[in-house]
């Protein structure tokens, strides 16, 4: 979940 969110912001 957190990894997916950060990936989107990246």
From Swiss-Prot:
Domain of life, per lineage: Bacteria
Keywords annotated in UniProt: Stress response
Induction description: By salt stress and heat shock.
Protein name, UniProt field: 34 kDa protein
